[in-house]
Amino acid sequence: MAKQRIGITVKLFGGIDLDSGFSEYDPDKGLDLATSEGIRLAKVLKTAGVKVNADTVYFVNGAKAGPRVKMKDGDTVFCMKPLAGG
């Protein structure tokens, strides 16, 4: 049986869009992806062309997530670099 197609939105913050080479990235819209049900976060990011590193933090629908989280239809992924200031 074929896996169902799902839609996922990926939003990039802290310059990840520029690091990944997205010169026309719209932070209000993010990146919309159509992919297979059950795909893991790491594969979503690779498929989208998002450059990842050990410092990047990920959230799925507002909850912190790791690379092995399975995605569902309608999920929104937020990718952020650590911020510092003071």
Question: Which residues does each PLM region occupy?
Answer:
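Ubiquitin-like/PB1-type beta-grasp interaction modules and other compact soluble beta-rich domains
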Residues: 1-85
